[in-house]
Amino acid sequence: MNNIVHKLKTLVLNEAFGGVLLIVCTLLALLVQNGSFSEHYREFLNLKVGFSVGEFELNKPFLLWINDGLISIFFFAIGLELKKEFLHGDFKNPKNIVLPFMAALGGILIPAMLFALVNIGDAYTLKGWAIPTATDTAFALAILMMCGKHIPSSLKIFLLSLAIFDDVGAILIIAIFYTTKLSIVAFVVAGLAILAMLILNLLGITRKSFYFICSVILWISVLKSGVHATLAGIVTAFFIPMQTKNGEAFLEEIYESLKFWIAFIILPLFAFANAGVNLSNIDIGAIFSGVSIGIFLGLFVGKQVGVFLFSYLAIRFKFAALPQGSNLKQLYGVCILTGIGFTMSLFIDGLAYEVSDIFNYADNLAILIASFCSGIWGFIYLKFFTTRS
């Protein structure tokens, strides 16, 4: 029995399984939204959930609890991984940072430029310039794992490293470009919560409950401040100690304990809540609008071109080297997979257009189509057109 449980847990934590689960949740959301349960689906997402303490009240639709709350946990895990890599991992050596950093930079600049070129002159549609800059790491990794043993493991490490910088880019974009009216009082409370975590860290205190309380206060204050609440997750991660006073791995333990919940609950639930595009509301004109074309070109063309071009230049001018055991063809195949924006692109789309249906959901459909095309083409290319090395 224990062996079965262990195998199930291993399966769930496998990146490929996580990607397959996201695909299932995406298809399920599309079926439910366009079937007889569509009304229940919308009621579920719009269900108000909250609490009040005295004059303070926090009452939000369930969809916002997912997008602002659960995704903060995902960004918290990204922050933990980033801190771990910089202090004790591959990023401790500056040479290992150059290639994924340049790749991520190209994967942000080129898609954004393509989107802007298509939508130039329209201030409202230009708000979505960051939509095609994101990559859904779980999906991309899942497809890479399915491509066969001739793909070296170094490319998986490259994709994971690229994803970290890609997520940092997304965090900065959200913080700088997608904030609303700011609240000074909320910022003061957030600052006090950060100060408390800094003191806990400097004193070497590793009581999880203390950090949890501070992180909740920080999350609520950031939510009320006008800055997107997911930033609370990444900030909290930076103050988590690497180890206890006894030398036990504290940060690693927290990171490992979150993997199951992120892979099995948070990301699938996010996909189910955000991928429900109502196909009956989409018209041909909306599909060929500047926003839809910009998203498709940015994700399917811009991502692979930008990531590969900047990677090639870094290698060509000897700022970086190819991942061990790989060749340029295989590297390009991985670059194609970065066009799978899916959950992260849907997330930024919701911030850019404030979950509006002004484009008749054609923007969401463009994200799904571009992600699907990137995934299929990336798989075919890596599986059948790359040479063994």
From Swiss-Prot:
Protein name: Na(+)/H(+) antiporter NhaA 1
Organism field: Campylobacter jejuni (strain RM1221)
Keyword Ion transport: yes
InterPro entries noted in UniProt: Na/H_antiporter_dom_sf, NhaA
Membrane topology of the entry: Multi-pass membrane protein
CC annotations in GO: plasma membrane
GO molecular function terms attached to this record: sodium:proton antiporter activity
Keyword annotations: Antiport, Cell inner membrane, Cell membrane, Ion transport, Membrane, Sodium, Sodium transport, Transmembrane, Transmembrane helix, Transport
Family label: Belongs to the NhaA Na(+)/H(+) (TC 2.A.33) antiporter family.
Chain ranges passing through the membrane: 12-32, 62-82, 97-117, 128-148, 157-177, 184-204, 220-240, 260-280, 282-302, 331-351, 365-385
Domain of life according to the entry: Bacteria
Cell location: Cell inner membrane
UniProt keyword Ligase present: no
NCBIfam families registered for this protein in UniProt: NhaA, PRK09560.1, PRK09561.1
Record's function text: Na(+)/H(+) antiporter that extrudes sodium in exchange for external protons.
